[in-house]
Amino acid sequence: MKTILKFAAIALSMVSLSGCLAGKYMSNYALKPEVHGVADIERTRHKADSLMPGSTKWYDELKAEGVLKDTTIVGYRDFKVHACYVPAKDPDHAQGTAIVVHGYGDNHLVFLYLVRMYRDDFNYNVLFPDLQYHGYSEGDHIQMGWNDRYDIEKWIPVAHDIFEDDFMVLHGVSMGAATVMMTSGDELPEYVRCFVRTAATAQPGTSSHSISMTASTCLRSRC
C-alpha cells in the first residue's frame, strides 16, 4: 500500500511539474515572443500596406517632409516608450486629437489606415504610440492592455500639450481596444471625450466603412 501511495505521489508531482513548465512556456510564448520590437518593423510595414495599399508610402512622405514626427517619454516602470504624431491635414481648423492604439504583436505602423482616416478624412491631429515590448518602445514583456493603460494616460497630456485641443478621442484595435476601454475607467482629463474600440478582424475593404461610421458618429457627438 505504501508503495502504491509513493508512486501515486511521484506521478502527481510529475504531472504538476509538467503543468507548471507548460504554463511557463505558454506564458513566455504569449508575452515574450522572440521576434518583436525593431526586429519586427519590416513585417508590420507589409501588414500596414496589406490593410491599405500605400499606407507606408504616405507615412514615409510625411516623415520626410518633417510633418510626421517621433517622440519618447518615460512610461510605466520607467521603460522608454515611443510614439509618432502628425498634425491635422488643415491644422488651423483641426477638429480635435486622436490617439490610435495598436493591438497584440503589432506597432504604430500597422493601423496607419486609421491614422490616415483621422487626419485626412476627419481633420484630426493624431498621436499613435508603440505599446511596451512593441515597435521602438522598451519593455520586458507584452502588458496585454492592463498596464498599457498607464502609458496611454501619460500620452494623453503629451498629445494635449503638442496640439492644444479641447477634444480628444482614444481609438484602440484588439488589445489596443482593451487598453482604451480600461483607460476609460480611470480618472481622465475632461477633454478626453470619446472612446472607440475596433475588433482585430476589422480591415479596410470589408469593414472599414463600419469603422468610419462608428468613429464619425462618436466624433459628431462632441459638445
Predicted regions and their residues:
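Alpha/beta-hydrolase fold nucleophile elbow
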Residues: 163-174
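A short loop-to-beta-strand scaffold at the N-terminal edge of the catalytic core in hydrolase folds
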Residues: 76-88
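Hydrolase active-site cap/lid region
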Residues: 182-223
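Alpha/beta-hydrolase active-site loop
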Residues: 141-163
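Conserved alpha/beta-hydrolase
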Residues: 115-138
